[in-house]
Amino acid sequence: MKFDFVYLGQTVLKYQVPLEIFVGLNEIYERKKKQLPKANKQLVGKIQDEVSLFYSGPNNDKMHQHCFLPDDILKWFHSIFDHYTDWNKIGPTQKSINSIWVNEMKAHEYNPVHIHQGKLYTGLSSVMILKLPKETGVEYSAEEKPMNGRLQIIVCLLYTYPS
C-alpha cells in the first residue's frame, strides 16, 4: 500500500488509489449518474450535481439506504480505514462506512469550509478526485506553483479579538 504522511495536528494520509478502483468508480458514476440519489440536501457544497453511491445510515427524509458499489470497491475503502487506524495505533474500533458520494463540480461551484462528524473520535473522512478539468483558470498569485484544482485541508481556524 503506497501512501504519504502529513502531520497537521491530526494525521492525514494520502493514498495511491489502485487503477481498477479509480476506473471502477468513474465507470459506475458515468453509467448510473442519472439514477443515483441526489445528495444535495445532506451536503453543504454549493454544487448542483451531488449524488450518492453508498449510504448505510438511518433512513430519513434526506436519504435512504442504498449501495451502487461492488464488494471489491467497498473492501478497498475498508482496507484504507483499517490501515489508517492501525498506523495511528487507534483501536480497537468498530468502523462502518456511512456514505460515499460524488460532487461533480463546475465553474463557480465550491465546497465551503465544514467539518465531518462520525462516531469515531478521529472523525475519519476521505476525498478522492476522480477527474480534473484541463483548464482550472488563471493562477493570479503563484504562477510558479499553481494551486488551482488542488485540495486544501484546513485543520483549524482561530479567531482572536478583544472582548
Which residues make up each language-model segment?
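Conserved small/polar residues in nucleotide/adenosyl-binding loops
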Residues: 159-163
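Conserved double-stranded beta-helix
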Residues: 72-147, 152-155
